[in-house]
């Protein structure tokens, strides 16, 4: 059979002989490709949760559907908690399910391609790769996401509850202008901190924490590599 290459790896050479370095390189490439193939549902998740929280309470007041919720035997607290749970648990669970489905669909598609070229998908893909470990990693990220996204979800729902109009602008402008004020007057110097600390830990955390993976920069990557 003719040689086929995927991501720069020669399938013919790998089939005939693989040393430990080749096997490690192949496994890394497969795992990375799987994670990339399942990335788009996680990106969509960030935008969906952002705008869902932003309109969760504002839209009800606008179209008076809040009257429907008040007619149910639920307190306002229960209503808010249910919406927060939808954003923090239900939405990421659905996104992770879609991401896992995309990863396995990608593996099946590449397996069919390998079979068509007389390759062995078990030894070239499923063996070196870690599809179950990657799926477990995504599932384990759900509680991490729920905790990490909580500041943004809380801030957006707060803006949604009290803003009379344009909750998006209020949600963006307040932390951004606060950051500009802090930077302009160097307020953080009082605490022996740079203005960048406020932008990273207050502004960014209040607006961007609903996007999966934004917690990576605060982790010790070497510890999990």
Give residue ranges: language-model regions.
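Secretory targeting signals
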Residues: 16-47, 82-161, 220
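Perimembrane helix-loop junctions in membrane proteins
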Residues: 56-63, 106, 110-118, 165, ...
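Transmembrane helix boundary and interhelical loop/hinge segments in multi-pass membrane proteins
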Residues: 51-70, 81-84
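Short helix-to-coil transition segments within interhelical loops
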Residues: 71-76
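Hydrophobic alpha-helical transmembrane segments of multi-pass membrane transport/permease proteins
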Residues: 1-17, 40-50, 97, 173-186
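Transmembrane helix segments
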Residues: 132-136, 165-213
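Low-complexity, proline/glycine-enriched hydrophobic segments characteristic of transmembrane helices
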Residues: 2-29, 194-225
């Amino acid at each position: 059979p003719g040689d086929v290459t995927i991501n720069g790896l020669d399938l013919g050479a790998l089939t005939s002989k693989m040393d430990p370095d080749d096997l490690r390189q192949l496994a890394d490439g497969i795992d990375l490709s799987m994670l990339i193939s399942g990335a788009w549902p996680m990106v969509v998740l960030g935008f969906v949760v952002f705008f869902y929280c932003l309109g969760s309470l504002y839209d009800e007041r606008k179209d008076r559907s809040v009257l429907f919720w008040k007619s149910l035997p639920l307190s306002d607290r229960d209503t808010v908690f249910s919406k927060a749970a939808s954003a923090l648990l239900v939405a990421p669970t659905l996104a992770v399910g879609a991401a896992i489905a995309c990863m396995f669909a990608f593996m099946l598609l590449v397996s069919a391609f390998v079979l068509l070229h007389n390759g062995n998908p078990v030894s070239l893909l499923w063996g070196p790769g870690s599809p179950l470990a990657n799926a477990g990693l995504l599932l384990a990220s759900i509680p991490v996401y729920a905790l990490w996204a909580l500041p943004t979800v809380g801030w957006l729902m707060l803006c949604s509850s009290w803003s009379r109009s344009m909750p998006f602008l209020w949600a963006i402008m307040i932390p951004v202008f606060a950051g500009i004020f802090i930077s302009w007057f160097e307020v953080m110097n009082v605490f022996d901190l740079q203005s960048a600390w406020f932008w990273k830990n207050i502004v960014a955390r209040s607006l961007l924490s609903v996007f999966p993976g934004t917690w990576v920069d605060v982790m010790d990557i070497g510890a999990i590599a």
